[in-house]
Amino acid sequence: MRGTKFELDEQKASKLSGMSVDEVWNFINQKAKEADLIVVKNGEYHAKGNSKDQSNLAIFIFDELFEIDWFTKSVKTWEQFYDDEIVEDIIFILQSNMAETSK
């Protein structure tokens, strides 16, 4: 099973987004559904086990969440996994990309 999970500073996300905590999670969960992912719980999303898993996760992570300023400033931990093994630390990838673009 492929997926992603993260821990969010809910109060910070709420403040930066101008939404309530419930609205923040509803927004994120809707983005996951639009990327055809399974919402396991707030902050944990699984792919459906088909040929589009990797692309659906990439859409959710990089095309959706990565582009939301209040999200990237509020996320505490963020990992992508495969069969319950951590594959990538998304925060490390984001920081590396930011460092590259600022050169």
Language-model features, listed with the residues they occupy:
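Basic nucleic-acid-binding interfaces
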Residues: 2-8, 13-103
